[in-house]
Amino acid sequence: MFWDFKHRIEQSVTNFRETTYEAFSRCKLFLKTLPKTSIFFLTVIILECLLIICFEGYCIGQFRTVELLKNLGIDSLPISLTLFIFACFFILYLCVEALSSKNIIEIIGLLCIHVALFIYSIVQISELAEIQKVFLSKTQSSLNPITLILNRHEAGNEGIYFILEVPKRIKPFLIALPVILGVASVMLGFLAHGMNKAYGWVIYKKIGPELRMRRRYLVYKIYVTLLKIDIYFFLGVTVQYVMVLPEDAVVEFVLTILVLPLTVLILTLSFNSVSSENMFLMMTVQFFYVCGIPYILFKIIRMYTSTQKEYYASSKQMITTFSVITLLLLLFTIAIGFACSHNFKKGLKEYCM
């Protein structure tokens, strides 16, 4: 029995080594096939993501030390910081996929994501000041440091620490985020221009010299890229809606939770409908996308006009920004979706399979 157990462990270790070696071999082979411009592009993405993850992780850690924020319902900034970290992994995945398939449309999509995150990172800085104001109003404190220190026994050490220490510690890192994204975007844009020359022939080689078919294929690739970007933004905005709901909004909480699997299902059907040129399925998902417009508008308006608008005071700037970006993306997805459906049954299907 002992030898059996030992043999199983040795077999598991051997399998792990073989799998790891195979993964490294594939990675090495992948890097060898890339031109220098693409390697520089990937390097910039990796360095950028590492810096953002480190900075955001530090900021989240500082917020998590103040339990009072969660009790007061104003811990919205850590949620947006966490979404930023997930955005880094998403960007890295999209970059590797774009480079491996030599897809210049996805490269351009990456640049668009950077612009959106750049705007979002600027809003994060102003949101910190808003959270401070809401914290002070809910704890009935003053922003005067002398008053805070004199009343520290009444207000609580945790509140004093948040007002005096946390913003001072994390603000430089929040300011660094748009700087990193801005510099990286400029570098990536310059590299993408060079990659366009190398990858520009991919569509021509796949489709041939027929101009109309190439344009149809280009529209198809734009739509597929949009759907991939939609995955992050659609799910991200829904998660934010869930996290900031009041505790007594049970029905709305359940309905918002149900939007998550519905979003995944609709996006999956979108991929299938456009690749199989299924008009009925395409119109079905388009209908759901159109329904998403009033849904997002309702969520935005509700934060500013409902009787519980004070509950959203510390997070409405970030959620509004993310919602507007998602809404614009949704409108663009609908428009390109109709353009794709117009190209059905015109010989493009064989190139999309």
Curated annotation (Swiss-Prot):
Spans through the membrane: 39-59, 76-96, 103-123, 172-192, 226-246, 249-269, 281-301, 318-338
UniProt topology in membrane: Multi-pass membrane protein
InterPro entries: UPF0658_Golgi (IPR040410)
Signal peptide start-end: none
Main location: Golgi
Keyword terms of this UniProt record: Golgi apparatus, Membrane, Transmembrane, Transmembrane helix
Location relative to the cell: Golgi apparatus membrane
Gene Ontology annotations for the cellular component aspect, listed alphabetically: Golgi apparatus; Golgi membrane; plasma membrane
Family recorded in the similarity comment: Belongs to the UPF0658 family.
PANTHER family, per the entry: UPF0658 GOLGI APPARATUS MEMBRANE PROTEIN C1952.10C-RELATED
Protein name as catalogued: UPF0658 Golgi apparatus membrane protein C23H3.04
Annotated source species: Schizosaccharomyces pombe (strain 972 / ATCC 24843)
